[in-house]
From Swiss-Prot:
Observed effect of gene inactivation: Slow growth and bleached leaf phenotype when grown under ambient air, but normal growth under CO(2)-enriched air. Thicker leaves due to enlarged mesophyll cells when grown in ambient air and associated with altered thylakoid membrane assembly and starch granule ultrastructure; these phenotypes are partly reversed when grown in 1 percent CO(2) atmosphere.
Catalytic site: C209, H350, H389
Known partners and oligomeric status: Homodimer.
Leader peptide range in chain numbering: none
Protein name per its UniProtKB record: 3-oxoacyl-[acyl-carrier-protein] synthase, mitochondrial
Keyword Lipid biosynthesis found: yes
Enzyme class: transferase
Primary gene name: KAS
Length: 461
């Protein structure tokens, strides 16, 4: 009898599993995903309009690092001065604070002891994106069908340093009860979910500099597979502090040659590049199932039609010289979209201004797009010359730049390409001025330490 019941139970379980697989396949095949809202906080300013205008105009959000920027408030002056002196890189891309238009108002967004900067940036960007999408649901069912997928690269290192100092000073009882929830990367998603009552998937990718792209791509699949109808997705970061800058400096990842001329330090694809400029900020988009967006008359910026991922399986920080991981990510995004390489109008390159990484990505773009790239037909650029490298937020912010390129018909420029890398020639060359053009399709690349790669492909609709 027991055996018979077990067989019936297993048979029923298999039937339910088969139905689930069938349903999931159906969702993946038929549920299209579109972008209906945008929000950002960047070194170029708070808000999409301010950031985009300054980007297209060729402005730069990078400045020199100061002693106060190290976030060492509990340390004595001698230690602060010693630490600052030891840092080989003294440039960074900061979010502009203030109460004026285009500035980040900490009184509005950092008004709780439980909120670290990276969380505040994400909530601010999400608020702009949701208002842009006109999606602030009040019905319980709509909230249950709305999720959040906002990742981060590091969390709040400065809060960890301050907490460790309490141990050194034998003052552990002064440790804030908010310490743990303040530093956890997933708390950016958590705070957005709580603020708006969203009860769909609550997710946070942590994949170094590919985080923002993975968070958006994962959110797209959640909609495709029916887990949600709307997802608030993106990345956030605030890691300009003594320990983070020291750590990246020790790994020889940061620019050190342009401390006296900060706005020239981030120079993707240029021969004089010597490392990236650390930045901060957040980019968040509202993703929505296409029919759901149409029914409510939502403004649609673009469709997210391709998401490709890969692993280098090569080195902890450097890509392989042949760029195979980047090639696989771009190729897989193209395959999912059903588009051919010569149908892509613009590529927002990951290029961070590192000697190896930029050349490898340029080589990968030539491999994937072939004559379409080498003939000069394909437009491509790296926007990190203007923003610096926003680490976990980079993929999301640059996805927004790609979407805006489609929306406004302008491909943004690459700053500081004065002496192009030898891999380029007269036709195969990154944009050095913003270009008005018809952009029907745009790809955004994001690659991270550990050999993690992601490419997002957007198309007009």
């Amino acid at each position: 009898m027991a055996t018979s019941n077990l067989r019936r139970h297993l048979s029923a379980s298999r039937l339910r599993l088969n139905r689930f697989i069938s349903t999931s396949s159906s969702y993946h095949s038929h549920r299209r995903v579109v972008v209906t809202g945008l929000g950002m906080v960047t070194p170029l300013g708070r808000g999409v309009e301010t950031t985009w205008r300054r980007l297209i105009d060729g402005e730069c959000g990078i400045r020199g690092l100061t002693l106060d920027d190290l976030k060492m408030k509990s340390f004595d002056e001698e230690t602060k001065l010693y630490t600052f002196d030891q840092l080989s890189s003294k440039v960074a891309a900061f979010v502009p604070y203030g109460s004026n238009p285009g500035e980040f108002d900490e009184a509005l967004w950092l008004n709780s002891k439980a909120v670290a900067n990276f969380i505040g940036y994400a909530v601010c960007a999400a608020d702009e994106a949701l208002r842009d999408a006109e999606w602030l649901p009040t019905e319980e069912e709509e909230k249950e069908r709305t999720g959040v997928s906002i990742g981060g690269g590091i969390g709040s290192i400065c809060d960890i340093v301050e907490a460790a100092q309490l141990i050194c000073e034998k003052r552990l009882r002064r440790l804030s009860p908010f310490f743990i929830p303040k530093i956890l990367v997933n708390m950016a998603s958590g705070h957005v979910s709580m603020k708006y009552g969203f009860q769909g998937p609550n997710h946070a990718a942590v994949t170094a500099c590919a985080t923002g792209a993975h968070s958006i791509g994962d959110a797209t699949r959640m909609i495709q597979f029916g887990d949600a109808d709307v997802m608030v997705a993106g990345g956030t970061e605030s890691s300009i502090d003594a320990l983070s800058v020291a750590g990246f400096s020790r790994s020889r990842a940061l620019s050190t040659k342009f401390n006296s001329s900060p706005q020239e330090a981030s120079r993707p694809f240029d021969c004089d590049r010597d490392g990236f400029v650390i930045g901060e900020g957040s980019g968040v988009i509202v993703l929505e199932e296409y029919e759901h967006a149409k029914r409510r008359g939502a403004k649609i910026y673009a469709e997210l039609c391709g998401y490709g991922m890969s692993g280098d399986a090569h080195h902890i920080t450097q890509p392989p010289e042949d760029g195979k991981g980047a090639v696989l990510a771009m190729t897989r995004a193209l395959r999912q979209s059903g588009l051919c390489p010569n149908q892509i109008d613009y590529v927002n390159a990951h290029a961070t201004s590192t000697p190896i990484g930029d050349a490898v990505e340029a080589r990968a773009i030539k491999t994937v797009f072939s004559e379409h790239a080498t003939s000069g037909t394909l437009a491509f650029s790296s926007t990190k010359g203007a923003t610096g490298h926003l680490l976990g937020a980079a993929g999301a912010v640059e996805a927004i730049f790609s979407i805006l390129a489609i929306h406004h018909g302008v491909a943004p420029m690459t700053l500081n390409v004065k002496n192009p890398d030898p891999i380029f020639d007269k036709r195969f060359m990154p944009l050095t001025t913003s270009k008005k053009m018809l952009v029907r399709t745009a790809m955004s690349n994001s690659f991270g330490f550990g050999g993690t790669n992601a490419s997002l492909l957007f198309a007009s609709i």
